[in-house]
Amino acid sequence: MTFPDLGRGVLHPGRAAAAISLIRYEPAPELARFVEFYWLVRWNRDGLPAHEQKVLVHPSVHLVLEAPAAHVHGVGKSLFVRRLEGTGHVLGAKFRPGGFRPFTDRPVADLADRIVPAAEVFGPGADRLNDEVLRGAGDLDALAARVDSFLLARTPAPDPVAEQVAAMVERIADATDLSRVDQLA
């Protein structure tokens, strides 16, 4: 299933809609407890000025597949800005809170405000996946299926603590009546 909206974090959505397309895909059901969605951004600025896109980051880890290399973006605390020129696309996986931890043996806190090569976390298969994604710009369903396959091959055993944290964060995100931390108790 696709979700065609630009999302909550995209600043200046009117300008963004004229410069980029953003499509979201649901992950395979077996990955849904780890990955909230995949996102694909495409642009064609050939013959046009570069477009600077600003995004308010969500408190999530992302696997980002793009030229020249795949990266893992840790939870950021600042505005994300990307200059888009020429023609291109980027495919990402937005992990749920607590959903990335089972895929790595390092503390997720070590990734905070950092961008690291995906191969450091996932091994050399991440570079091969990145090459496939960059070559496969046309078939969006196939790209999402390829990322599904990559992550399914690395699916960890369930982590009860991560699942509990994810449930708590989801409750907080969905609760419109919460305004103080002590209301969670």
Model regions and ranges:
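Short, basic interhelical loop/turn and adjoining N-cap
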Residues: 185
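Alpha-helical bundle regulatory/interaction domains
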Residues: 1-182
